[in-house]
């Protein structure tokens, strides 16, 4: 389970990452853009994306995926004080991604770009505490998926 300071840091940083739907779409596009740029091999998991989507994530399907991911992350942040719910969400996330052939190692690649994502998405307003809290949450999700 996450510590109280980590939970607070997640909630605080979430306001910067997902203030509204437009911000959530922008955050999703940025996160996946960083993933695809850093790890082009991850594109194999997104068979329904075309070159334009991979280039900018600024297509209907790209925006929809980014929004879905950030809606899911929002569920974790919103329920972060309820360990049973967080664990249930982690198991659901794992089931959904296992069915698509996405491994814990694939999640680790996303985790690897997350600090850069936080810097870029927040205009460098993400603190070390924010970064550590997201790293702890992602580590927990990876563990649930292993």
Swiss-Prot record:
User: Keywords assigned by UniProt?
Assistant: Acetylation, Heme, Iron, Metal-binding, Muscle protein, Oxygen transport, Transport
Q: Organism, per UniProt?
A: Buccinum undatum (Common whelk)
Instruction: Give the family from UniProt.
Output: Belongs to the globin family.
Q: Which domain of life is it from?
A: Eukaryota
Q: What PANTHER family does the entry give?
A: GLOBIN-LIKE PROTEIN
GO cellular component assignments: extracellular region; hemoglobin complex
User: Taking every annotated instance into account, which residue ranges of this chain make up the domain Globin?
Assistant: 1-146
A single GO molecular function, which one?
Answer: oxygen binding
By its UniProt entry, which InterPro entries does this protein fall under?
Answer: Erythrocruorin, Globin, Globin-like_sf, Globin/Proto, Mb-like_M
Q: N-acetylalanine is carried by which residues? A: 1
The protein's name is Globin
Subunit text: Homodimer.
| Keyword Zinc part of the UniProt annotation | no
Q: Does the keyword Iron apply?
A: yes
Disulfide bond annotation, renumbered to this chain: none
Residues annotated to bind heme b: 65, 97
């Amino acid at each position: 389970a996450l510590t109280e300071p980590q939970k607070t840091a997640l909630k605080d940083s979430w306001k910067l990452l997902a203030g509204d739907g437009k911000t959530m779409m922008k955050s999703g596009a940025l996160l996946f853009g960083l993933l695809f740029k850093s790890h082009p091999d991850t594109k194999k998991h997104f068979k329904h994306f075309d070159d334009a989507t991979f280039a900018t994530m600024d297509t209907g399907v790209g925006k929809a995926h980014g929004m879905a991911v950030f809606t899911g992350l929002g569920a974790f942040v919103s329920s972060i004080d309820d360990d049973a719910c967080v664990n249930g969400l982690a198991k659901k996330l794992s089931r959904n991604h296992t069915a698509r052939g996405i491994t814990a190692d694939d999640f680790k690649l996303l985790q690897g770009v997350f600090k850069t994502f936080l810097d870029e998405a927040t205009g460098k307003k993400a603190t070390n505490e924010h970064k550590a809290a997201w790293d702890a949450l992602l580590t927990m999700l990876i563990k649930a998926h292993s």
